[in-house]
Amino acid sequence: TRDVRVMFYKNGGTGAAPTNLNNLWYIDTATLNFASALAPSSDLALQGILDLNIVDDGYGVNGSQGKAIHVLATADIADLSIYGIGVANNGGGTDGEEYNFESTASATAGDNILVVRSVEAMNAYMDASTIFDQVILGSSSISQNGNDAIELYLNGTIVEVFGDADVNPDTFGAGCGDDVNCWDYEDSWAYKIGGEWTYGGVNCSDGTATTWDSTCVYPLAIGQEPDKK
């Protein structure tokens, strides 16, 4: 916080009228205390949000095997546990920080990190352990559906948000019709390119065995199909 000195005084005497420009109130001797609204600088960024429709092959996560969050380290991070993730469900507002990285986790600048519900499922669907620098098994808090906003936290403070915690895009219909600002990613993904979010298209992973079988190959997996490298 910072202290700001301001002063109040009136020009024009006791008979000053508010319509008289010569009779203005000026500021004198008062101290205001305020906190900066700027978010702290983050060395971790949201890069992709996945809600893939992966067939359950006994992965044991109650149908959540296609859910994952892709983050990118923009600098070396010695302790990832200062970062966390929150899933804001159905436009109901923030639910706060729900997942924290382990204190033993670290990252190198440029690392693509995938936080998943099932490592086995993501390896089968997109060879994740080869494509990503790290694949981390997350908790049940990685629970997003295609209409849920995602919040990235640093030391308990939100530093980035995908979507809008107070909006449920499903209320506009699957895919949101012609709304260019829509961020629905049901059975699909969202991916950041040049600071802008792009989308695979609602339901584009339905009925596919791998990302390369779909009409919406996950961008980091393009050209990475195991038998075509």
Where are the language model's segments positioned?
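Intrinsically disordered, low-complexity Pro/Gly/Ser/Thr-rich segments with frequent PxxP/GP/PP motifs
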Residues: 98-124
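Conserved beta-structured recognition patch
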Residues: 82, 136-221
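Short aromatic-acidic-glycine turn motif
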Residues: 87-101
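Acidic glycine-/aspartate-rich tracts in secreted/extracellular proteins
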Residues: 11-14, 38, 73-79, 89-93, ...
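Extracellular carbohydrate recognition
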Residues: 12-35
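Extracellular beta-strand-rich recognition modules
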Residues: 2-15, 19, 115-116
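A structural motif detector for short, solvent-exposed N-terminal "entry" segments of globular domains
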Residues: 38-91, 142-145
